[in-house]
């Protein structure tokens, strides 16, 4: 089983995670039954509306006469309306009714109610138990309850029973602290919507209602509304990535604006000073003395079970005796305080998990986007964002795994889940949270880089696509554009290599970079078995086998395998050299070339020998130096170009033109059966067939090998010099498909033809920024600029002499090997370089030209003598008459 299939199985088996302890479960029944273990089983004081099907008992132990709702049989509770259900399937069906009710177009038509209330039927209402008023939202209901709480004195509690379901216990996975909070949701025409008479309500003894508190298990902060509690919990646990980018980006900008910055966590304070409590509608943060006074004034109706939930040292509320015991242990053993941010934690395990956030220890990596997480639960929750069909998707773009949280979120948009209007983000405003990288002291561009894409000046994006405003790249989904902007343009480099200190944008990049230190290469090429340290490098390498170069320059037609290489190449056409040397003023268009240039100013190269004071610019040169000089062994040399390498593996990795010509030909033409060495050559060969036409077939046999340019003697056959020029039998012409219109020379690729045409047009698109000299090819400019920079990157492994051009190094190596591959066909003398042979051949050419001039002079002298001899005798009259018309026709004047 592959790694990808294993992750898929893991994702299927662990679809549900407990929001309290992050434990994973494979089914909904397991996680719901597990979450009941977090619900406290004490006898809470509940004054509420009971369902007729639920048993109601009196708590006689406390003597208060309050009603306690038993929930042993109904273990599954809906957090939307508080109704208790018997099985997970019933809970899901019940929650689906909420979805249909909140979406008008999907609602099931209901029977007409007997009496239509004045409010809208599509709104869920909240009823006040005192005055029977209905409200459309929890916020309005809560504000109304505040007026009753401030105006009503405290009296003996009395039960209030109505005919509709209520929340009798705490929600699953949340903290419910207060005990006398009751409310009812009434729907138009729904059952159990009967309101008692006014006489019955006047006889009721109204009690002081304590508000429900939702306590965060991470920071102990209390909330009144479940929606606020869920929104706060999202600050501790990352939510899934939304499918639509724009709403999420707007929320991020609004949440991070300086005018309104939300506080996700309270200020870190010692455990003895925690004062997060809300009673009787008063503000959170009263002192301990005031809380104890209010608790004493409320009477002893709380019972012993309620008093056990208060810490005697700091008067903090807790949900269960287990949490209280853990808190008391923090008083005995001391609080667990973070040494970096001074935040206090109740247990050492929570502190260890928090310290992992500071150290960026994320052991669970997402294989899709490279983001890292500290726990497997967070990774699995994040992986759901990559699924094509999220479980619950909101029209605003957010996705949810939990249906209850999805229902709470939809209520924030209003009726039917319609998104609220949001203010669009200005295009030029940067993404919040990702600051611009600070410029370095030296080597940074002094001017902004010009756009290198051909689509920069194009019009608006095509319908259904999203264009990046920085690089004009288009994407099919808004989520892809978001990830591109965050991880390419704005993401800061916050992941550091522990060995060399290099910074990276993603954790996965650090992981791939560490393989350069360890030497691990776990990704081999299936074609040549060459290993690589990352899948991206393997994908780039495989382009060399296929011959594909998808990135082509629009100015010179040169193609590249990487988009970054094309962008750097186009800087040459744009005359943009942003990287300037501070010492000599020479500019470069690539930062690594500036870095290599600086070594020549300092005189110290990065790779130093440990046994001698010599240093080298390349690691390969250092390894060859240690092998030859210190170890006394011979390096591995390339038989084609003579380059030396320290190992056979490095020699196999080396690629040169001569070795490529000798490579086995594995690509066969389907028309003529010819085999070539690469897919690019096969494509050019097939183009030659297409250019030849359907009636012509290229010769299957290759033509006779042409003699090298150095061994071909210039042929001179002057006509009329006393000899006849014999033409050699013409070989069958082999067309290649691309022909020069000026000189009819054939080429196999479009790039070669465009470079050749510059010879006829005189175009030189690569000028030198230092001296102004222009060149036809970028490689010629690159070699020329080394004359200005003094850079000599090609050093001999034997004597250490450095050269600016690799060809000069190859010629220099022949001094040590004694090789002389270039021989003169006239005299047989051999040379180490082609330039020396060319100079020698000029002497033979001069001798040949002198001989030709001598032959011409002798021929002219012989012709002159013949004219002088024949001009003495006069022509007969008849012949003169015949010659005269011919002479006039040719424009020759005959004297005499």
UniProtKB/Swiss-Prot annotation:
PTM annotation (Phosphothreonine): residues: 724
Q: Where would one find coiled-coil regions in this protein?
A: none
- UniProt entry keywords in alphabetical sequence: DNA-binding, Metal-binding, Methylation, Nucleus, Phosphoprotein, Repeat, Transcription, Transcription regulation, Zinc, Zinc-finger
Q: Where in the cell is it found?
A: Nucleus
For bias type Polar residues, the affected ranges are 247-257
**Record has Nucleotide-binding as a keyword:** no
Q: Which GO terms describe its biological process?
A: regulation of cytokine production; regulation of immune system process
Q: What is its main location?
A: nucleus
Enumerate the SUPFAM superfamilies for this protein.
Answer: beta-beta-alpha zinc fingers
Q: Which GO terms describe its molecular function?
A: DNA-binding transcription repressor activity, RNA polymerase II-specific; RNA polymerase II cis-regulatory region sequence-specific DNA binding; zinc ion binding
Q: Which SMART domains match?
A: ZnF_C2H2 (SM00355)
**One term under GO cellular component:** nucleoplasm
- What spans are recorded as compositionally biased (Basic and acidic residues)? 274-287
Q: Where are the zinc fingers (C2H2-type)?
A: 16-38, 76-98, 126-148, 214-236, 309-331, 336-358, 364-386, 392-413, 466-489, 495-517, 523-545, 551-573, 579-601, 607-630, 636-659, 667-689, 738-760, 766-788, 794-816, 822-844
Compositionally biased region (Low complexity): 707-732
* Membership in a protein family: Belongs to the krueppel C2H2-type zinc-finger protein family.
Protein's name according to its UniProt entry: Zinc finger protein 574
Q: Which organism is it from?
A: Macaca fascicularis
Q: Which gene is this protein's source? A: ZNF574
């Amino acid at each position: 089983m592959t790694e990808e299939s294993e992750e898929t199985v893991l994702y299927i088996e662990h679809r549900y995670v407990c929001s309290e302890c992050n434990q994973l479960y494979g089914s909904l029944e397991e996680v719901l039954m597990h979450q009941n273990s977090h619900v406290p089983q004490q006898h809470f004081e509940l004054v509420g509306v009971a369902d007729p099907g639920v048993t109601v008992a009196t708590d006689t132990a406390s003597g208060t006469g309050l009603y306690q709702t038993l929930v042993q049989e109904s273990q599954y509770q809906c957090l939307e309306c508080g109704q208790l259900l018997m099985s997970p399937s019933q809970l899901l069906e019940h929650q689906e009714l909420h979805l249909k009710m909140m979406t008008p177009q999907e609602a099931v038509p209901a029977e007409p109610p007997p009496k239509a209330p004045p409010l809208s039927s599509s709104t869920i209402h909240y009823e006040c138990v005192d005055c029977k008023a209905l409200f459309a939202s929890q916020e309005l209901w809560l504000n109304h309850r505040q007026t009753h709480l401030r105006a009503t004195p405290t009296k003996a509690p009395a039960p209030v029973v109505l005919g509709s379901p209520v929340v009798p216990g705490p929600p699953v996975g949340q903290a419910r602290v207060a005990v006398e909070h009751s409310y009812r949701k009434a729907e138009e025409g729904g059952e159990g919507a009967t309101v008692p008479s006014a006489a019955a309500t006047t006889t009721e003894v109204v009690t002081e209602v304590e508000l429900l508190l939702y306590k965060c298990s991470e920071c102990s902060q209390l909330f009144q509304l479940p929606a606020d509690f869920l929104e706060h919990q999202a600050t501790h646990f990352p939510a899934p990535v939304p499918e639509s980018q724009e709403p999420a980006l707007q929320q991020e900008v609004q949440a991070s604006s300086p005018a309104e910055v939300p506080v996700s966590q309270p200020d870190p304070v010692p455990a003895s000073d925690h004062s997060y409590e809300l009673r009787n509608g008063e503000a959170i943060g009263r002192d301990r003395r005031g809380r104890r006074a209010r608790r004493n004034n409320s009477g002893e109706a709380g019972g012993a079970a309620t008093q056990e939930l208060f810490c005697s040292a700091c008067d903090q509320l807790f949900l269960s005796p287990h949490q209280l015991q853990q808190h008391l242990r923090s008083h005995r053993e001391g609080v667990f305080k973070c040494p970096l941010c001074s935040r206090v934690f109740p247990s050492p395990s929570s502190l260890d998990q928090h310290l992992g956030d500071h150290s960026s220890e994320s052991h669970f990596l997402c294989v899709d986007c490279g983001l890292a997480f500290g726990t497997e639960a967070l990774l699995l929750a994040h992986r759901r964002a990559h699924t094509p069909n999220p479980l619950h998707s909101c029209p605003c773009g957010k996705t949810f795994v939990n249906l209850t949280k999805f229902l709470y979120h939809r209520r924030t948009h209003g009726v039917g889940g319609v998104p609220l209007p949001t203010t669009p983000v200005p295009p030029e405003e940067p993404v919040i949270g990702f600051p611009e990288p600070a410029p370095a002291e030296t080597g940074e561009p002094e001017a902004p880089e010009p756009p290198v894409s051909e689509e920069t000046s194009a019009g608006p994006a095509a319908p259904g696509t999203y264009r990046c405003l920085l690089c004009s790249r288009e994407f099919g989904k808004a989520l892809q554009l978001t990830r591109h902007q965050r991880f390419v343009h704005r993401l800061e480099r916050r992941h550091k290599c522990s060995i060399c200190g290099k910074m990276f944008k993603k954790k996965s990049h650090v992981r791939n970079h560490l393989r350069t230190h360890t030497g691990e290469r776990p990704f081999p090429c299936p074609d040549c078995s060459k290993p690589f340290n990352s899948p991206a490098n393997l994908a780039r390498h495989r382009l060399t086998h296929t011959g594909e170069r998808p990135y082509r320059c629009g100015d010179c037609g040169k193609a590249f395998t990487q988009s970054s290489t094309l962008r750097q190449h186009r800087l040459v056409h744009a005359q943009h050299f942003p990287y300037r040397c501070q010492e000599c003023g020479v500019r470069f268009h690539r930062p690594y070339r500036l870095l290599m240039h600086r070594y020549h100013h300092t005189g110290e190269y990065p790779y130093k020998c440990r046994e001698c004071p010599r240093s080298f610019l390349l690691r390969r040169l250092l390894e060859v130096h240690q092998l030859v000089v210190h170890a006394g062994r011979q390096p591995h040399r390339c038989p084609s170009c003579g380059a030396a390498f320290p190992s056979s593996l490095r020699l196999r990795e080396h690629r040169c033109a001569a070795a490529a010509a000798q490579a086995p030909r594995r690509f066969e033409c389907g028309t003529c059966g010819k085999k070539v060495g690469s897919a690019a050559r096969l494509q050019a060969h097939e183009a030659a067939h297409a250019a030849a036409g359907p009636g012509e077939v290229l010769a299957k046999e290759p033509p006779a090998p042409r003699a090298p340019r150095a061994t071909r003697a210039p042929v001179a056959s002057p006509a009329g010099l006393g000899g006849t020029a014999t033409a050699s039998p013409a070989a069958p012409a082999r067309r290649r498909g691309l022909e020069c219109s000026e000189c009819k020379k054939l080429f196999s690729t479009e790039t070669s033809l465009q470079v050749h045409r510059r010879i006829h047009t005189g175009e030189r698109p690569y000028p030198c920024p230092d001296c102004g000299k222009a060149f036809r090819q970028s490689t010629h400019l690159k070699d020329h600029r080394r004359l200005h920079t003094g850079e000599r990157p090609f050093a001999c492994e034997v004597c250490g002499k450095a050269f600016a051009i690799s060809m000069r190094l190859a010629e220099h190596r022949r001094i040590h090997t004694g090789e002389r591959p270039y021989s003169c066909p006239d005299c047989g003398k051999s040379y180490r370089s082609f330039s020396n042979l060319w100079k020698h051949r000029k002497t033979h050419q001069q001798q040949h030209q002198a001989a030709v001039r001598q032959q011409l002079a002798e021929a002219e002298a012989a012709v002159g003598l013949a004219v002088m001899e024949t001009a003495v005798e006069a022509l007969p009259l008849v012949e003169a008459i015949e010659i005269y018309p011919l002479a006039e026709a040719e424009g020759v004047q005959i004297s005499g």
